[in-house]
Design a protein with these regions (language model features):
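Extracytoplasmic ligand/sensor domains, especially the bilobed periplasmic-binding protein
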Residues: 1-25
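Solvent-exposed coil/turn segments that connect beta secondary-structure elements
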Residues: 3-4, 93-95, 121-122, 141
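Extracytoplasmic/secreted proteins, especially bacterial periplasmic and envelope-associated proteins
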Residues: 6-10, 34-37, 41, 95, ...
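Extracellular/periplasmic periplasmic-binding protein-like sensory domains
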Residues: 16-29, 35-72, 83-87, 101-147
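Structural motif
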Residues: 89-91
Length: 147
């Protein structure tokens, strides 16, 4: 994933040079208002939300204990079903990166099943105080020695 900004040509060239297989690239808007809609499409959010509503309707009229437990469990969810990717590498930083992370959390991307990695984060301590993504991986250095 990378933003559609003035660095996109460089990112696209480097990705092409890597000659990666079994990957998809996703270019997104730097505008946070547009970004969430793009991430919703990427994650199939609308369909997963509909899946949940349909499943809940299956149990709403039932009175047996197992159906009630199932409905109670479903009420705790935001969507039903996973996304069609197992990892994401985000080539971004700063507030734009935070917007992407927030959109991934909003669209109910399961952090237990999807590895989220960024390449430009070690220098921005503010990301440590964000609570939208708990399992974020990034390359690092010995920060004390760097300073």
């Amino acid at each position: 994933m990378y933003p559609d900004n003035h660095y996109k040509s460089l990112v696209e060239k480097k990705l092409k040079d890597l000659n990666l297989t079994s990957t998809r690239t996703f270019k997104y808007s730097s505008n946070p208002e547009v970004l969430t809609g793009e991430i919703e499409k990427l994650t199939n959010y609308s369909q997963r939300k509909k899946n949940l509503e349909l499943r809940k309707k299956m149990f709403e009229d039932k009175e047996d204990e197992q159906s009630l437990k199932q409905l109670e469990r479903l009420e705790q969810l935001y969507t039903l079903g996973g996304v069609n990717f197992d990892s994401v590498i985000i080539i971004d930083f700063g507030n734009s990166l935070k917007s992407v992370l927030t959109s991934l959390a909003y669209t109910d991307v399961n952090q237990e099943k999807v590895l989220i990695t960024t390449v430009n984060q070690w220098f921005d301590e503010s990301i440590f105080y964000e609570n939208t993504i708990k399992n974020l991986y990034y390359p690092s250095i010995n920060y004390k020695e760097f300073k």
